Amino acid sequence: MIVLRKTLAVLAAVFLALAAAGVGAQAPGLPQLNRDYVRLDPPRPVASGDRIEVIEFFYYGCPVCYELEPTLARWLFNGPASVTLRRVPALATDNWDNFAKLFYTLEATGHLARLHWPVYDNFHFDGIKLNEEAVMVNWVSHNGVDKEKFISAYHSPEIQAKLAAARDMTRNYEIKGVPSIVIDGKFVTSARMAGGTRELMQLVDRLVELARKERAK
């Protein structure tokens, strides 16, 4: 059974914190290169057309990624306009493979939107070892996923290809830690650089605007 008892409390706390933070807040200055973000040189290609591409590199086992997720979900729900979000499981080490395979298998079987947050919550809050394949398979089968279809997809060449692509992207985008966010193939920032998860999404908004201005030149 999915344990979601913390979800509403987490989201409510995030919304209240964001609302409180907005009272009396001063307009932030321009993002500072090499302090708030780094610039990829050359810029990496994007496939988002007229939209600004935002890529989140994450790891389900990362507590800061877990903390970020409700804020990121709220940011995605509210805008900004003309932005597309892409999630990529970072693969800095082979120990992260199982969680990346879980992400891509849930995506391939059509259950990612429903189970993305519960993976985080059940792992971090409930201590369910979802990075272990046997535990993972039992968990998904108890949460409405066909067990045999999941296992077949999990071990398929298609998922292995996605892992290889994610590993290449982690290296190509010079990802040093998670969560990291890449804006329009040009700017890379992180919760560490921003000073926190709430500050990270505020910084992303500013970098999206910077990317939009650079596109207009």
Named regions from a protein language model:
Residues 66-69, 96-100, 194-197:
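Conserved strand-to-helix beginnings and helix N-cap segments that scaffold or border functional pockets
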Residues 142-217:
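C-terminal cap of thioredoxin/glutaredoxin-like
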